Curated annotation (Swiss-Prot):
Enzyme class: lyase
Protein name per the record: 3-hydroxyacyl-[acyl-carrier-protein] dehydratase FabZ
Alphabetical UniProt keywords: Cytoplasm, Lipid A biosynthesis, Lipid biosynthesis, Lipid metabolism, Lyase
EC number: 4.2.1.59
InterPro entries: FabA_FabZ, FabZ, HotDog_dom_sf
PANTHER family given in the database record: 3-HYDROXYACYL-[ACYL-CARRIER-PROTEIN] DEHYDRATASE
Keyword field contains Phosphoprotein: no
Similarity comment: family membership: Belongs to the thioester dehydratase family. FabZ subfamily.
NCBIfam families listed in its UniProt record: fabZ, PRK00006.1
GO annotations of cellular component type: cytoplasm; membrane
GO molecular function: (3R)-hydroxyacyl-[acyl-carrier-protein] dehydratase activity
Pfam families in the record: FabA
Keyword rRNA-binding: no
Length: 157
């Protein structure tokens, strides 16, 4: 990613997200990033649909988005901030910690989840974020997460 692209990107469609993150279907949990504020915050979007594979077993007849996938959506939104800031290209952003996770309301097919991610601090390759997942303006989940940029082994490329 060029220096101009790193500084000018204020939103990202799915194509741009796939340049920032290594995740792919069915594990890419962010469909769009509607706002990236420098390296400080971002808002990612996940449109939850009934045909996603997790709903086959969670739960038949009463589908609910697994909380761990909401956390993953938060982490991927945070990862996009890290990748954009550092222009890491082929390197990876590893999810390191989850603290203070809370699940407030169920998320179901048809919901549009907004992942609000705010950087709390950064030291070297270590980043800390506070994250909220919202549906229709109401917090459905929240967590504090940690991430680390890991330089990819060129032999594994």
């Amino acid at each position: 990613m060029t220096e101009d692209a790193k500084t000018s990107l204020s939103s990202a469609d799915i194509i741009e997200i796939m340049k920032l993150l290594p995740h792919r279907y069915p594990f890419l949990m962010v469909d769009r990033i509607i706002e990236i504020d420098s390296d400080n915050s971002a808002i990612g979007i996940k449109n939850v649909t009934a045909n996603e594979p997790q709903f086959t077993g969670h739960f038949p007849g009463s589908p609910i988005m697994p909380g761990v996938l909401l956390i993953e959506g938060m982490a991927q939104t945070a990862g996009a901030i890290c990748a954009r800031k550092d222009g890491i290209g082929g390197n990876l952003v590893y999810f390191m910690t989850i603290d203070n996770a809370r699940f407030r309301k169920p998320v179901v097919p048809g919901d549009r989840v907004e992942f609000h991610v705010v950087k709390q601090k950064q030291r070297g390759t270590i980043w800390k974020f506070h994250c909220d997942a919202k549906v229709d303006g109401s917090v459905v989940a929240e967590a504090d997460i940690g991430a680390m940029i890991v330089r990819k082994d060129p032999d594994q490329a």
